[in-house]
Amino acid sequence: MNYKDTLLMPKTDFEMRGNLGKREPEIQKHWESIDLYNKVLEKNKDNTPFVLHDGPPYANNNIHIGHAFQKTLKDFVLRYQTMSGRYTPYIPGWDTHGLPIENEVTKSGVDRKQLTRAEFRKICREYAIKQVEVQRAQFKRLGILGDWDNPYLTLDKSYIADQVRVFSQMVDKGIIYKGLKPIYWSPSSESAFAEAEIEYMDKQSKSIYVGFDMMGDKFPNTKLLIWTTTPWTLPANLAVSVHPNFDYVWFNNDGKNYIALKELLPKLVEKLGFSHAKVLKEFKGSTLEFMNYKHPLYDRVSPIILGEHVTAEDGTGLVHTAPGHGEDDYFVGKKYNLDLLSPVDEKGHMTEEAGPYAGMFYEKANAQIVEDLRENGHLLYDETITHSYPHDWRTKKPVIFRSTPQWFASIDMLKGDLLEAIKGVKWHTSWGEVRLTNMIKDRNDWVISRQRVWGVPIPIFYDNENNPLLDRKLIDHVASLFEVHGSDIWYEWDVEKLLPSDYEGPRDLTKELDIMDVWFDSGTSYNILKRRGLPFPADMYLEGSDQYRGWFNSSLTTAIAVDGVSPYKEIVSHGFVLDGKGRKMSKSLGNVIDPLTVMNDQGADVLRLWVASVDYEADVRISNDLMKQVSESYRKFRNTFRFMLGVLDGFNPEVNYIGWSMRGQLNRVMTDKYYVLATKVNESYAKYNFVEVTRLIIPFVVNDLSAFYLDYTKDSLYCDAEDDFERRAIQSTIYDILLGLLRLLTPIMPHTTSEAYDSLKYKEYDNIYLEKMPIGGKLKEPKLQENYDIFDELRNHVLKHLELAREAKVIGKSLDAHLDLSVDQTTYDALEYLDLLNKLDKILIVSSVHITKADQLDIKVSKADGHVCARCWNIVKEVNQNDVCVRCESVLEGLK
């Protein structure tokens, strides 16, 4: 007789195969249809707010794995805070100005030269908005909840108006000024760059040692030894710097005299082949001040000056000084009233001031200058070196120092307040505070102007003598016009139309044509919180570790300048995403992992589970092989949820629920284990330690549930009468644990937990996201757990012996086994406390157990004697005429 239909087999609509690529978008549509984001906000609206302010990604091309990694981390934080009862509005944002968009528009065939600035800007705007639409859909596909219908864009009229008002206040406080200084300049982008836009990469350069002929009688027939890796800056040389307190030597080699730093002489002797060097005199650097030398390429006399920036680490101790091409050179030159010579144009070509090198690209001039020095006898040594050199972070091409008129924000004015504000920020990692502190300490004034078109205009007027009108009232008026008409009017309207009606200042004005640094754009994004009535400062900024020099830095600067407070209360940062071998991803290496492909093939929840399984504070790795491992972990979760949902078929918690105290010992143990787990998981979430969350939950699901509790309880769940007390106690335990696990995992796998929650027949809300995060608790009965641990150790020994018996073909499956157990008094007492002495066969999934006390553990496995029950497959002493055991006979009677 077939008893299959009499068994209570699991039934659920939660499918074994996730098919997440198809199912997740359907789940997301459901979230939108019930307005889930606003529903949770409404539920928590009277509670304490938690604001994570979104750093704006750049609106260009599809999202990459770094975007997915970061946005998912933010979603973890927000979902946890939401389910903990906090009010968590989240406004996504986009950075929409800048050179990459200009380049993409130009690449598409748009001829910039045939268009007005306003026409070109309109095309850039259209492109940026399309990119926002693309990325918005991709971020939503990740399962990120937020106010996607009302994001902030740095091109929005209101955003720009608020940004200009920040600029206006900084002007009013004297923080903004225009100056001629050497700044990072990218010939490939034809624009000034801030320090945050520079990335250091290896570069091959010419390293040369040059002799400058001294003038005067004090050191006759003498060459000053200088070293440089930028020969193209020699046309701009206006001085040689020495350290006032260092010891220098005048020495002779083969009849020629030289001056160099005493400490570096041994290195120079070796490098330059000065095998007969003889020191003639020692003296302090200050001795050389105001002495003169002749330029090696031009008919020009220049002075020796003193500079504290001179070091004894490399070179010669005498520094070629070109105030137009270096920060240190600029400041030391200012002390000595040196000119600011910078004979290089915006494209990197030498100007007429460079004489014979005019028109050459600076790198070509490099080679020519070296040859000219060789020919005129001033080149003492040259070689090619590889060194770390600043590059344009967009074009990846070298940048140069070049002096041009630019707008600056004075960091010196703010530095004390910035450093003080950093102390008041909560740092998720202590090194984050150190890193930003050091960056602020070493930071020079911020060049905020860019010689581009697509960005926020710098709304400054000039009088007929080219003096800027630094008038807050004027700038605020322009801001109000931008808010209504947009910033293109700066290029479309004439000056008179841009001025206030009551303006009484000078006429015949012209407009500044430079735009603001995009870091000034994003660095004022906290204005969106004020504009939308949200708490300021934000509770958290969470971004990549590169933002210590970028967004964390620029946001702090503008907020301190205007509000006097940090825009963030806490900083959390993450590392970079590398391939499985720890290499940077690139198309050329073929190691790029596309998040869109992962989501379509494996699912957003699998990608999110990967994010939760790595230590985000450091650089992390991802590869197809690693994703397969994560998929396997996901499959275990899904199978476990499916089984638990299936065995809850027919269970109504309002009718069938058995309270904790009445459930029996092992059910209470499992519930207690879950409560302790929930406590630890909450603690980990509160510390944003997501990898610890997965490290805690996965072993519980795989070992405690799947491999033990859900395995041994199958007999009762399938074969006992539906209303059997023990069966209902097990179902009550499973119900508690399942509902708890789904809530604990919702921040990480929201699609899967939503789907599983929907499959629960009895629940309180439309979506699990409306549930509260379970808080867990301490062990209700510590002694219960202590005794369980003793049993668990015994069980592990038994499992090993069963496996050996299986390998020896004594048994096939564990139900074929009979166990003879000899245990010590402690183990026996533990089994008695757990009420397991007569239940070990069920718990160990064998057919019979004989237990005795002994001094030490002994386990014997033999084949069980008896009859196989045709319904439950246990081997029992007796079966009835229908081949079923006493228990199954009773259940079948009840079904009649």
Curated annotation (Swiss-Prot):
GO terms for biological process: isoleucyl-tRNA aminoacylation. Its main location: cytoplasm. Zn(2+) binds at residues 869, 872, 885, 888. It is an enzyme of class 6 (ligase). The keyword Ligase applies. Disulfide bonds: none annotated. GO terms for cellular component: cytosol. Keywords: Aminoacyl-tRNA synthetase, ATP-binding, Cytoplasm, Ligase, Metal-binding, Nucleotide-binding, Protein biosynthesis, Zinc. A motif ('HIGH' region) lies at residues 57-67. InterPro entries: aa-tRNA-synth_I_CS, aa-tRNA-synth_Ia, Anticodon_Ile_BEm, Ile-tRNA-ligase, Ile-tRNA-ligase_type1, Ile-tRNA_ligase, M/V/L/I-tRNA-synth_anticd-bd, Rossmann-like_a/b/a_fold. Its EC number is 6.1.1.5. L-isoleucyl-5'-AMP binds at residue 543. Its cofactor is Zn(2+). One of its GO terms (molecular function) is zinc ion binding. Binds 1 zinc ion per subunit. It catalyses: tRNA(Ile) + L-isoleucine + ATP = L-isoleucyl-tRNA(Ile) + AMP + diphosphate. ATP binds at residue 587. IleRS has two distinct active sites: one for aminoacylation and one for editing. The misactivated valine is translocated from the active site to the editing site, which sterically excludes the correctly activated isoleucine. The single editing site contains two valyl binding pockets, one specific for each substrate (Val-AMP or Val-tRNA(Ile)). NCBIfam families: ileS. Belongs to the class-I aminoacyl-tRNA synthetase family. IleS type 1 subfamily. Monomer. This is Isoleucine--tRNA ligase.
